[in-house]
Amino acid sequence: MERTVIALAIISVVKGDQICIGYHANNSTKQIDTIMEKNVTVTHAQDILEKKHNGKLCSLKGVKPLILKDCSVAGWLLGNPMCDEFLNAPEWSYIVEKNNPINGLCYPGDFNDYEELKHLVSSTNLFEKIRIIPRNSWTNHDASSGVSSACPHLGRSSFFRNVVWLIKKNNVYPTIKRTYNNTNVEDLLILWGIHHPNDAAEQAKLYQNLNAYVSVGTSTLNQRSIPKIATRPKVNGQSGRMEFFWTILRPNDTISFESTGNFIAPEYAYKIVKKGDSAIMRSELEYGNCDTKCQTPLGAINSSMPFHNVHPLTIGECPKYVKSDKLVLATGMRNVPQKKKRGLFGAIAGFIEGGWQGMVDGWYGYHHINGQGSGYAADKKSTQKAIDGITNKVNSIIDKMNTQFEAVGREFNNLERRIENLNKKMEDGFIDVWTYNAELLVLMENERTLDLHDSNVKNLYDKVRLQLRDNAKELGNGCFEFYHKCDNECMESVRNGTYNYPKYSEESKLKRKEIDGIKLESMGTYQILSIYSTVASSLALAIMVAGLSFWMCSNGSLQCRICI
């Protein structure tokens, strides 16, 4: 009867009022990595790596790209007859050229410093084509017979639209001396060429003069070209070759042409009306009737994220390219929902075993149980402070990283392969550095965020512990058990930091003495029971040993001698 009373008293102590410090949990399956751990499930996270694109070529900030389709830049600028739709191209945001456009130099040959020309074009947004030397001004030369089956138009032989192939007239090719003064306020892009015949017979047939030359001069250019007559294999049905040149004529500068044959004269030039952040992108995509701030060869990216892994070449205001597959910033805390079998007061912060899915209005808070019931209450002050800090950190990272960043491909001619390889290695190295920096940044910030949450929960726990002092007992799982009755008003005072320790200290003191007395009485009772149990067990063992010995002596299994 006495033991029953003691047990009931102990149970009544365990059922005392309690308050627990805990943290939010939810059904999130988002995972992040830290310096120390991988695949940590958190309540909230923000992806900062864009992986998607729309698979289309789009306008860039409302300005359409110049998509050259099957034409190359050379075919467009010289006026390949198959590129007539681009003769008067409107303003463009960027230029799109296929990897292997079929309509380039229809008459076989070469474009001198072509890569530099493309670099110039890539920093231009608008050309205005103007006539500088009219075709009908060549009265002493044939300006209409210079056509080729290699450049057909509507089934007939034709030639590049923006230049004139001059042929002898009446078996005479008078020396050409022409000048043009740039009276415009803009720079002019001027194109011309020279024809290299297959043999001397073709040279005489077209130009009469066997020792021809083409000279071009400006304030910065002094060039003299001589036809290279040689036997060559046919390309596009032609054994001859054409070599094209270009220059930029500054305002108020003059260009002079002198030639005794083989001259491909400029008829039109390009006024560079608008310079800007353009580029030449290689892509096989079609225009998608869309608008974007960032374009890649694979499609447009519309994202505010600071990083992407779509394609290393971009045009516009783009995130930075990294090779990573995953960059996720933790904005919440570890998501460890409390296991039901542990009950409500199970045991982040090193001592709390699980989060509360019932607390939905804050990251950290309290759960209480008393005679008036139980409930959750978030600590909104510490939650808001943490949210503001993490939000500012994430925004700061995005703002610092998400600046305009372009990475357009550079082209090199066949003599510059070593430079091209070196350039590629350098660009790959930069990408590797960016990738490493981005991944390290995320890992470090995630570690700091989780540590911040642990620290905030621990601070909340210490705030309660310092208020309650010896008016409550620490249960070791984030909970405190009061030595006094604590109604809802009392619980609220603990939560808001106004707990009145002296008010409850006397009641707590009496309760502690009562519990200590029960423990002492219980200890005495259990000591008596322990002694009784030990003596009884020893006596029973002695009787068993004696009985076994007597039985063995009686049947001869054991010799018994009694000495007096």
Swiss-Prot record:
GO terms for cellular component: host cell plasma membrane; membrane; viral envelope; virion membrane. The chain crosses the membrane at residues 528-548. Residues 549-564 are cytoplasmic. GO terms for biological process: clathrin-dependent endocytosis of virus by host cell; fusion of virus membrane with host endosome membrane; fusion of virus membrane with host plasma membrane; viral budding from plasma membrane; virion attachment to host cell. Residues 1-16 form the signal peptide. A lipid is attached at C553, C560, C563 (S-palmitoyl cysteine). Palmitoylated. In natural infection, inactive HA is matured into HA1 and HA2 outside the cell by one or more trypsin-like, arginine-specific endoprotease secreted by the bronchial epithelial cells. One identified protease that may be involved in this process is secreted in lungs by club cells. Residues 17-527 are extracellular. It is found in: Virion membrane; Host apical cell membrane. GO terms for molecular function: host cell surface receptor binding. Pfam families: Hemagglutinin (PF00509). InterPro entries: Capsid_hemagglutn (IPR008980), Hemagglutn_HA1_a/b_dom_sf (IPR013828), Hemagglutn_influenz_A (IPR000149), Hemagglutn_influenz_A/B (IPR001364). The record marks R342, G343 as: Cleavage. It comes from the Viruses. Binds to sialic acid-containing receptors on the cell surface, bringing about the attachment of the virus particle to the cell. This attachment induces virion internalization of about two third of the virus particles through clathrin-dependent endocytosis and about one third through a clathrin- and caveolin-independent pathway. Plays a major role in the determination of host range restriction and virulence. Class I viral fusion protein. Binds to sialic acid-containing receptors on the cell surface, bringing about the attachment of the virus particle to the cell. This attachment induces virion internalization either through clathrin-dependent endocytosis or through clathrin- and caveolin-independent pathway. Plays a major role in the determination of host range restriction and virulence. Class I viral fusion protein. Responsible for penetration of the virus into the cell cytoplasm by mediating the fusion of the membrane of the endocytosed virus particle with the endosomal membrane. Homotrimer of disulfide-linked HA1-HA2. Major glycoprotein, comprises over 80% of the envelope proteins present in virus particle. The extent of infection into host organism is determined by HA. Influenza viruses bud from the apical surface of polarized epithelial cells (e.g. bronchial epithelial cells) into lumen of lungs and are therefore usually pneumotropic. The reason is that HA is cleaved by tryptase clara which is restricted to lungs. However, HAs of H5 and H7 pantropic avian viruses subtypes can be cleaved by furin and subtilisin-type enzymes, allowing the virus to grow in other organs than lungs. Belongs to the influenza viruses hemagglutinin family. This is Hemagglutinin. The gene is HA.
